[in-house]
Structures are given as structure tokens and as C-alpha cells.
């Protein structure tokens, strides 16, 4: 049996920070309220989004989640992004509905809630439940053409100014967090410099750093987005944009290194 240790992370820090492999035969458990231990379960990491209201809940969608992605220079279990939506299989959907019912009947939450889980042999193993707007939600919002904050407001009985349009055939959206491969300075020719910010239009970059700013190795640099008709196409687009950033930051050389 494999385990991981997890330290409670600061609020303003990347998801997945503080998670490390743990071998009880070689390491000693720390008696510290900031630490806890989880069994490591192999499988595909996924995210599910729920919206709870007075009468029950709605499963808004699921997506594939990645962490510790080496091509994005993410260490250990650092959050690396999401792709979706993905259609859950029947047993997965049944497990998610059961979990939603347990949460609803025992805790009576209202509004948006995200759950990270491992899908192993079509069985759901919950990892973390977050009663808030989570990093994977914008992927499903962009894919489905929906505003989840509208649903969140409605769950509290607040009438939103903006009503969600009818759902259309979803696109597939990919989101990836590019981490600094080494200490870098943001150059003037970064690919996002020429992009005019417009919240109504799909953009391939977000969380854009200021030109000339210094970012240390392992810290997030920028968020990459991709949009296509299939997961395969989305993966290809994200790979291409990641390679462009590797070239920009001279991965494999000492150029643009602050040290």
C-alpha cells in the first residue's frame, strides 16, 4: 500500500502544494495537526462540480484533472490543469449521485461545490471536497456556455441580472498551468502581449504576468487555454503552446535565468 502526506497549504498558494510521497516503512508519521495522510490510489484524477439548493443538487459536469505534469514543470502533486467536459460512465455517475445525496442530506450546503476524485476501475474515490468556486469550474463554464455564479446566486434565492442561455453542444476546453522551469524574467515578446483583454472572447492565455516581472522556479507563470472538438485536439494545442513557452524561456539553457 502506498501513501502520501499532505500539509495544510496557505490560502494563497497553488493547489497540490505540500503533498509528498510517504513510505511508512522508511518515514515516521508527524504528530502535527497541519499534516494528514492519505492512501495513494492509482487511476485517473478527475473533478466533479455540484450545485446544491434547498431541494437537492445538480451535477453540473466532470472533467479530467492533472497534477505534477512534468512538461509544465509542475513539481510533485502541484495542480496542472483540467480538460473537459467528460461524460462519466454509468457506475461513476451512480457513485457521484450517491456522494451528492450524502453531502446534501448530512450537511445541507447551498451553492457551488467541487470535488476532486480518483477514478479507478470505474469506481469513485473522493480526495477533497471544496465548498467554493474551484479551479476546474471555468473549464466547464467555457465548454458549456454557462455561468455557474448565476446558479450559485439562484441557490441562495438571489435573482441574477444575467440568465444563462440554453445549453448548446459543448466544446472541449483545456486549461494548463505553466510553471517556471527556472528563475525567469517576463520578456516583452511574450505571446500574450498582443492579446486585447476581452471577457466576452475566448483567450488562449490568462493570469498574465506583467512584462519585466521576475518569477522564481516552480512558481506559476501563466495559464494556457485550448478549445477544440475533442480531447485529442485540445491536448495537441496545449502541447504546442507549452513548447512555445519552453522556447521563450530557453528551457535547457541558462538564458533568461535570474541566477
Predicted features, each with a name:
Residues 33, 46, 55-58, 111-115, ...:
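Structural beta-strand/beta-sheet cores of well-ordered domains, especially the beta-sheet scaffolds
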Residues 52-57, 119-123, 181, 228-229:
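Short acidic-glycine loop/turn motifs at beta-strand connectors
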Residues 2-21, 33-49, 60-64, 115, ...:
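ATP-grasp fold ATP-binding core
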Residues 153-259:
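Peripheral (often C-terminal) accessory segments that flank ATP-dependent C-N-forming ligase machineries
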Residues 39-102, 106-108, 130-156, 166-168:
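ATP-dependent carboxylate/phosphate-activation module, predominantly the ATP-grasp catalytic core
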Residues 104-138, 177-181:
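Conserved metal-phosphate-binding beta-hairpin within the catalytic cores
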Residues 16-18, 60, 70-71, 137, ...:
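Short helix/loop capping segments that flank catalytic or ligand/cofactor-binding pockets
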